[in-house]
UniProtKB/Swiss-Prot annotation:
The chain crosses the membrane at residues 8-28, 35-55, 89-109, 115-135, 138-158, 178-198, 214-234, 253-273, 285-305, 313-333, 336-356, 377-397, 418-438, 465-485, 511-531, 577-597, 629-649. GO terms for cellular component: plasma membrane. Keywords: Cell membrane, Membrane, NAD, Quinone, Translocase, Transmembrane, Transmembrane helix. Coiled coil: none annotated. The gene is nuoL. Belongs to the complex I subunit 5 family. This is NADH-quinone oxidoreductase subunit L. It is an enzyme of class 7 (translocase).
Length: 653
């Protein structure tokens, strides 16, 4: 009973914090509002740790039916809380990172008048994310799914006086509506064919629908899984539906750390893992997931190399790492995908918040305009270095364990995407070293006054990062131990399903496969140092950042090709331009057609035309009202004459 109460409190506390700070924004004292937000989220994180230990040590699954929600014929849906191993580990990632971000925001947003509103939105997002991962049915999950989308819109556009922030918020919201439409269709199809939205009922009948073919090679289950995955592609920024994530960096940096690195963007990976009971019976969709994940991780990493905005580089890095996670799901290694999800939450949040420290200190996003900050911000440098090495996958940091397991699983499956994963590991190291060298090393390109006053942020911004540093170090070791348990899927044995009882072949891979990810990471580090350390001497040639970005390109016969490639990468493979010409402009033309039909035809001959007829009739009628008695006498006499004439003529004929 105690653990059930704790489970409820984990979810309710962020909601209560959001309601208090949101509704009483102009009444409550700012200091009290901050205390409420921080204390409630910290308690939620503490309770999550208790629940995690209980689920881990005792193996207990908590299922609480709070209240009946939908009852329609045979469809019955309850509002419930379902906590198994998968939910408990997600609770840890969400609440701990959210707590750190809340505390960090007190310093980062200290000068912002809307800080209480900001904290309210952050708490509301945390509530919806916890609702999403603790649902026991697809409809409740969808409520959390849409809730985090709305909060993302509010937080990206938090600085609503900036036009770029407003456009980014709208872009994120609309892009996700495209994928969410497929997600809704998937849920509707589940309800129609399964007659239920509850996980237990749907998963237990998965095999039945896998044998129900609607096309030659496609079953009903294939269609359901494909629709669900398209929903995941939008939320988790996979190739084609990724365009919103880099623009989302227009929001405050704490938002980027919480929503667009550690939590919301991983919701798609969580959904695929949760629905492993469905996806395992749809091998064709699993193959599609593997391909999309592999292409995305390489695609996003290649773009990150040529970006100059520090937050956008990390955003594309996030997109790339999400590709790794989906690649793992595609080869049925759901446990390593969730493992990487958790480790990634810690070191990527650390990278974003460390980048926030740099931006806060120098008020600049372009890394080619920075440099020499290692002596000014040594703690931030250390944090950024730890996060980068974890991202690259250097032992003993957490990324070494989780990324290694994904690549091992991909290798075991025989998928060609293993090669993509290895190339991505090299590119990851290169763009990580690019940031470190251009931001912290070499001669500064900042204005003298800005560089002179650059310093470490306050303790309230630096101290919370200790938790993320600890997570970047120890989450890998702990996770590796949990996955090494002598059960299928290790720690997640009751949450995940593998048709062929997939188990991590921890001791059965060749040694070179185990060492290859870190080896290529080291190679990438060396390449990055050679490229960008050497480019520092060229950076005094011009003040234009675009030229600085090209300075590393050697002067040779292949320079034209390299410049072309760099332009393609810098312009993000022209996805925005392609969408603008193929989708946006045709829609604008269609709107002009609708405008013409609405204004020139419907309105002109409809309500406006009717109004003109009435006005004309009124104008004619008004002319009769002259005010002269002889006119009225004439009208009366004329009427009498006409009437008498009518009856006389009628009698004659």
């Amino acid at each position: 009973m105690i653990h059930q109460n704790l489970a409820i409190m984990i979810i309710i506390l962020p909601l209560v914090s959001s309601i208090i700070n949101g509704l009483f924004l102009n009444i409550i004292d700012k200091k009290l509002a901050k205390i409420i937000a921080i204390s409630f989220l910290s308690l939620s994180a503490l309770f999550s740790l208790v629940i995690f230990c209980d689920v881990t040590l005792v193996g207990k699954i908590i299922h609480i039916k709070l209240l009946p929600w939908i009852e329609f014929k045979n469809l019955q849906v309850n509002w419930s809380i379902y906590i198994d191993q998968l939910t408990s580990i997600m609770f840890i990632a969400v609440t701990f990172v959210s707590s750190v971000v809340h505390i960090y925001s007190l310093g980062y947003m200290a000068e912002d008048k809307g800080i209480i509103r900001f904290l309210s939105f952050l708490s509301l997002f945390t509530f919806f994310m916890l609702m999403l991962v603790s649902a026991d049915n697809f409809l409740q999950l969808f409520c959390g799914w849409e809730g985090v989308g709305v909060c993302s819109y509010l937080l990206i556009g938090f600085w609503h006086s900036k036009e770029s922030a407003n456009k980014a918020a709208i872009k994120a919201f609309i892009t996700n509506r495209v994928s969410d439409f497929a997600f809704i269709l998937g849920i509707i199809t589940i309800i129609v064919y399964y007659g239920s939205a509850n996980y237990k009922d749907v998963f237990s009948s998965a095999k039945l629908l896998s044998n129900t073919k609607i096309f030659v090679h496609f079953s009903i289950l294939d269609i359901i899984c494909l629709l669900l995955f398209i929903g995941c592609m939008g939320k988790s920024a996979q190739i084609g539906l990724h365009v919103w994530l880099p623009d989302a960096m227009e929001g405050p940096t704490p938002v980027s750390a919480l929503i667009h690195a550690a939590t919301m963007v991983t919701a798609g990976v969580f959904l695929v893992a949760r629905c492993s009971y469905l996806f395992e019976y749809s091998p064709i969709v699993l193959q599609f997931i593997t391909i999309i994940g592999g292409i995305t991780c390489l695609f996003a990493a290649s773009i990150a190399i040529m970006q100059s905005d520090i937050k956008k580089i990390i955003a594309y890095s996030t997109c790339s790492q999400l590709g790794y996670m989906f690649m793992a799901c595609g080869v049925s290694s759901y446990n390593s995908a969730i493992f990487h999800l958790v480790t990634h939450a810690f070191f990527k949040a650390l990278l974003f918040l460390s980048a926030g420290n740099v931006i806060h200190a120098v008020n600049e996003h372009n890394i080619f305009k920075m440099g020499g900050l290692i002596n000014k911000m040594p703690i931030t440098y250390g944090n950024f270095l730890i996060g980068s090495l974890a991202l690259i996958g250097i032992y003993p940091l957490s990324g070494f364990y989780s990324k290694d397991l994904i690549l091992e699983a991909t290798y075991s499956s025989g998928s060609f995407m293993f090669i993509f994963g290895i190339i991505t590991a090299i590119l990851t190291a290169i763009y990580s070293m690019k940031i470190i060298i251009l931001v912290f090393h070499g001669k500064t390109k900042l204005e003298k006054d800005v560089f002179k006053h650059a310093h470490e942020p306050t303790k309230i911004m630096n101290n919370p990062l200790i938790l993320l540093v600890a997570g970047s170090f120890f989450s890998g070791m702990i996770g590796y131990y949990l996955l090494s348990m002598d059960k299928p899927n290790g720690y997640f044995h009751e949450s995940l399903f593998n048709l062929h009882i997939y188990k991590l072949l921890i001791n059965h891979h060749p040694l070179y496969i185990k060492l290859l990810p870190m080896a290529v990471g080291i190679v990438g580090i060396i390449i990055g140092i050679c490229l960008y350390k050497g480019s520092l001497s060229y950076q005094t040639l011009t003040n234009e950042s675009d030229q600085r970005e090209k300075d590393w390109i050697p002067k040779s016969k292949c320079k034209m090709i390299l410049v072309f490639i760099s332009n393609v990468l810098r312009n993000k493979y022209y996805f925005d331009e392609i969408y603008n010409h193929l989708i946006i402009k045709p829609i604008h033309c269609l709107t002009y057609l609708f405008y013409f039909g609405d204004q020139k035809i419907i309105d002109r001959f409809g309500p406006n035309g009717f109004a003109r007829v009435i006005n004309y009739f009124c104008a004619v009628t008004c002319k009769i009202q002259t005010g002269y008695i002889f006119n009225y006498t004439l009208y009366i006499v004329s009427f009498i004459v006409v009437t008498i004439s009518y009856f006389v003529l009628k009698n004659i004929y």
